[in-house]
């Protein structure tokens, strides 16, 4: 299995977890590093996607969607300072008990703190304004890692909704090439069946 197939399977399993925990909408501020997640979210027909190139306005738009629907809404952006523009809306979501699922993409570990472009410290960047932070593992397509990816998606959305609702943050280090295989038939339904009926929290 090549890198493109591995990344596609791993991220698809994660998105399946989001979907099965109630995510129906996602607001995407596109950028290079977020390409695979953005395209795979858009491919998922059960999730309605919106595009807003301005991260600050995207975050407040997602906040409004989540308030209106009372359901978790995904926010996705690229690496670097893009994620900092989410900060005001995340603070408001935390105070207002709104279940945002914030997905930031990041340079892989070997490109951090070495002067690579669009790289900054993204770990715990929203501090105590989110109720859960997860630094996702690099994509692998073993059965164990596909289960892990699915579980993190399901857990993230479930945590966001758990009373009192609040935003959660998952950070994805991703290596190039960043284009997923959109024609690939994945087996994420295996994770759905495996975790069916299990308590997420």
Mark where each language-model region is.
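Short beta-strand segments
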Residues: 76-78, 99-106, 127, 137, ...
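Thiamine diphosphate
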Residues: 1-79
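Conformationally flexible catalytic loops at phosphate/diphosphate-handling active centers
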Residues: 5, 49, 159-201
């Amino acid at each position: 299995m090549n890198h493109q197939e591995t990344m596609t399977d791993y991220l698809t399993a994660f998105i399946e977890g989001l979907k099965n925990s109630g995510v129906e909408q996602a607001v995407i501020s596109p950028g290079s590093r977020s390409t695979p997640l953005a395209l795979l979210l858009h491919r998922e027909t059960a999730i309605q996607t919106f595009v807003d190139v301005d991260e600050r306005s995207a975050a407040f738009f997602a906040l409004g969607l989540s308030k209106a629907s009372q359901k978790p809404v995904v926010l996705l952006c690229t690496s670097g300072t893009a994620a900092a523009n989410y900060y005001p809306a995340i603070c408001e979501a935390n105070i207002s008990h709104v279940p945002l699922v914030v997905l930031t993409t990041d340079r892989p570990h070997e490109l951090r703190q070495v002067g690579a472009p669009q790289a900054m410290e993204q770990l715990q960047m929203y501090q105590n304004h989110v109720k859960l932070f997860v630094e996702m593992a690099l994509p692998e397509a073993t059965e164990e890692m596909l289960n892990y990816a699915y579980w993190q998606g399901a857990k993230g959305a479930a945590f966001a909704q758990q009373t009192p609702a609040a935003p959660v943050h998952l950070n994805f280090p991703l290596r190039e090439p960043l284009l997923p295989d959109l024609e690939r038939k994945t087996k994420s339904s295996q994770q759905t069946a495996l975790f069916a009926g299990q308590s997420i929290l």
